[in-house]
Amino acid sequence: DYARELARSALDAMADGAYATPSGRQVNWSDDIERAKALKMSIRADDPLPTVEREPFARTIVQVRNETTMQAAATFVERGARPLALNFANGVHPGGGFLQGARAQEEVLCRSSALYATLAGDPMYDDHRRRPTPDSTDWMILSPDVPVFRSDDGISLEQPWLLGILTSAA
């Protein structure tokens, strides 16, 4: 299945620190992956929120658009913004079912970026697995600079771009 192949090739690209573009060029993104992993913050439900520098905005515009998370984020990045995408995540399995070829939002994010590298091994998943009830907490994982290397349809990009992703169990 194509989605499963994309998941395997994403894992290979992360492990190799490089991927091939449609033009045949090799893109070394190992530094981007390591930076994404180093910047990741696991925020327990009772942890204080990290402080951030706020930027004033002249106005807020709300739009409803028929786009995927990646399409919308790419549009904002092209306009010079730094979007933060909400990953509606599986609370017990990093990447949800992306390795099995599932096709929900989290799985597409993991197939198209190095998000999985920032989620794998996070203590949130073990904590949720140990819960006596089949639910999750408000624990979140902030991955502020995840390199995106593919479009939603699986086409490798000539140059990766960075996306902030907030992972929260849905």
Per-range role (PLM):
Residues D1-A170:
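Macrodomain-like recognition of ADP-ribose-binding/processing modules
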